[in-house]
């Protein structure tokens, strides 16, 4: 599969996975791969605590105002990567601005009125954010929008919010907004989800459960699943170190690494059997800091793994 084709098969890619699986790092790598394939890319984060900017060497936190993380036009011919954070308050202010209520918008948001409304109509905060994503998709602001979704448990609730409001609100702009968000989420040409997991038993169990919930309850198409943090396969781990002073330590290290490889291989196979989706494999990075160099490394691995896949097929 061509990496450019993978990135261009939909307009919005929602990256979803359990907390701790490297979802934001995968988002950064995906954006870099898409940009190198010539697609202008907008990353949208919804929780504002991901540290996404630092992956591109940015020291300031992202805000509602769009910023450029990586300008295009470099030696590699990559397109630009931009990013922003979406919050319900800011989305509400902008919505009111656009509907002729500029004078009261900031006062309404700063008064905490949105929290009162959210209590009366659960899901309203999420629909404000998703409504803005829908607006960005319609505006053609970028070739690809990548949404760094909330952690898996909240992701399903987040994406289900439109269905809940559609059931609760019978008429008016909120219902119209909810229906338009559902139209976005259920159109594979406009929106798909890319799942992220680790090659471990519990994360694999959780990503399988999340996948079926997203398909059954939200009706969204799944682009594939990223298996993050794979150790490189080492050969000759059963070689005898002989009588070297470090022999016992070497045997123990080799046994640990072999057990790790066997476990990861087993979980990757189990995931493929439980979830028949394209798999993207990304390596474990032996570092605690992820910056531009690491993002480039993962983007190359991402592209290589995509290139090894067969031609795309939409899973709906």
Feature locations, PLM:
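Residues at the beta-strand->loop junction immediately N-terminal to the Walker
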Residues: 15-18
């Amino acid at each position: 599969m061509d990496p450019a084709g993978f990135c261009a098969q939909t307009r919005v890619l929602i990256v979803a996975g359990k907390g701790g699986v490297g979802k934001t790092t995968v988002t950064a790598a995906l954006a870099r791969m898409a940009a190198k394939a010539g697609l202008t890319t907008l990353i949208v984060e919804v929780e504002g605590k991901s540290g996404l900017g630092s992956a591109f060497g940015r020291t300031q936190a992202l805000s509602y105002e769009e910023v450029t993380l990586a300008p295009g036009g470099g030696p590699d011919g990559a397109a630009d990567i931009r990013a922003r954070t979406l919050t319900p308050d800011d989305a509400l202010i902008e919505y009111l601005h656009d509907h002729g209520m500029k004078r009261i918008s900031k006062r309404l948001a700063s008064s905490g009125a949105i929290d009162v409304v959210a209590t009366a109509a659960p899901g309203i905060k999420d629909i404000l954010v998703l409504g803005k994503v829908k607006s960005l998709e319609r505006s053609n602001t970028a070739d690809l929008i990548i949404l760094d979704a909330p952690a898996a448990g909240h992701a399903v609730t987040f994406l289900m919010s439109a269905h809940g409001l559609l059931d609760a609100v019978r008429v008016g702009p909120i219902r119209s907004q909810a229906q338009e968000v559902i139209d976005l989420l259920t159109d594979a040409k406009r929106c798909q989800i890319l799942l992220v997991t680790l090659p471990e038993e519990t994360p694999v169990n959780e990503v399988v459960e999340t996948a079926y919930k997203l398909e059954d309850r939200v009706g969204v198409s799944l682009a594939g699943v990223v298996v993050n943090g794979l150790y490189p396969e080492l050969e000759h781990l059963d070689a005898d170190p002989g009588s070297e002073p470090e022999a016992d330590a070497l045997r123990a290290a080799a046994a640990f690494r072999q057990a790790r490889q066997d476990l990861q291989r087993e979980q990757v196979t189990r995931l493929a059997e439980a979830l028949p989706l394209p798999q993207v494999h990304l390596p474990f990075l032996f570092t605690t800091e992820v910056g531009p160099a690491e993002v480039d490394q993962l983007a190359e691995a991402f592209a290589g793994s995509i290139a090894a896949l067969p031609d795309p097929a939409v899973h709906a």
